[in-house]
């Protein structure tokens, strides 16, 4: 569970639709929706500058986000973020309300440690996953999952089942069965630089 809190101010949005959303974006507002927890969906807006700053934090994508909406604090998680195809602008956000007594599905990043040790051995860690989909109660969401690669050698690999998840946290993929135990990484030996003779042979 994260010790950091993520709180953002939002305003209720009465006008919806493409035209209204376009006007809001011109005013540097980001249209968004809050849904879930057996309640009606609520249309809101956030300041674009706040969203741009928020997305710099890894926790914005994985942790509980408290939205202050019209005097009410609503606990949510981010479910979707839409961006402009070529401008550095966020165009829409989807938030899901959370219930402290119900498990949720979310994604947390993988932090790899010990890669410097592997590199000194002339090998490289090839990442095949950078995040894991998990199920847990809201308060148990970890900031990230750590994978230590320092003792791996060329030819080694790790799968989701090799990762030690925190107590109360389970893998969505593993719950689907053994066939969904995805590879997280493999370790490959670096190709040695060709000798002078090998380089000459290759040129002939």
Swiss-Prot record:
Per its record, what are the GO molecular function terms? 5S rRNA binding; structural constituent of ribosome
Describe the subunit structure.
Answer: Part of the 50S ribosomal subunit; part of the 5S rRNA/L5/L18/L25 subcomplex. Contacts the 5S rRNA. Binds to the 5S rRNA independently of L5 and L18.
Name used for this protein in its record:
Large ribosomal subunit protein bL25
Native source species: Pseudoalteromonas translucida (strain TAC 125)
Q: Which family does it belong to?
A: Belongs to the bacterial ribosomal protein bL25 family. CTC subfamily.
SUPFAM superfamilies referenced in this protein's UniProt entry, alphabetically = Ribosomal protein L25-like
Gene3D superfamilies in UniProt: Ribosomal protein L25, beta domain, Ribosomal Protein L25, Chain P
- UniProtKB keywords: Ribonucleoprotein, Ribosomal protein, RNA-binding, rRNA-binding
NCBIfam families under this entry?
bL25_bact_ctc, PRK05618.1-5, PRK05943.1
* GO biological process per UniProt: translation
At the top level, the lineage of the source is Bacteria
InterPro entries, A to Z: Rbsml_bL25/Gln-tRNA_synth_N, Ribosomal_bL25/Gln-tRNA_synth, Ribosomal_bL25_b-dom, Ribosomal_bL25_C, Ribosomal_bL25_long, Ribosomal_bL25_short, Ribosomal_L25_dom, Ribosomal_uL5_bac-type
Its gene?
rplY
Q: Name one GO cellular component term.
A: cytosolic large ribosomal subunit
Keyword Membrane assigned: no
What is its biological role?
Answer: This is one of the proteins that binds to the 5S RNA in the ribosome where it forms part of the central protuberance.
């Amino acid at each position: 569970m994260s010790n950091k809190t993520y709180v953002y101010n939002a305003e209720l949005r009465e006008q919806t639709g493409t035209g209204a959303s376009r006007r809001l974006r011109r005013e540097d507002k980001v249209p968004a929706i809050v849904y879930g927890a057996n309640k009606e969906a609520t249309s809101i807006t956030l300041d674009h500058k706040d969203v741009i700053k928020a997305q710099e934090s890894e926790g914005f994508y994985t942790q509980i986000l408290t939205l202050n909406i019209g005097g009410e604090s609503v606990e949510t998680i981010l479910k979707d973020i839409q961006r402009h195809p070529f401008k550095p602008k966020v165009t829409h956000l989807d938030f899901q309300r959370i219930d402290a007594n119900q498990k949720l599905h979310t994604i947390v990043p993988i932090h790899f440690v010990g890669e410097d040790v592997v590199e000194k051995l002339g090998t490289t860690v090839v990442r095949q996953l950078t995040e894991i989909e998990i199920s847990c109660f809201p308060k148990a969401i970890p900031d990230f999952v750590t994978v230590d690669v320092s003792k791996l050698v060329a030819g080694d690999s790790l799968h989701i089942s090799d990762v030690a998840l925190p107590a109360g946290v389970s893998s969505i993929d593993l719950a689907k069965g053994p066939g969904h135990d995805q590879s997280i990484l493999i370790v490959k030996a670096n190709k040695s630089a060709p000798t002078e003779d090998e380089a000459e042979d290759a040129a002939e």
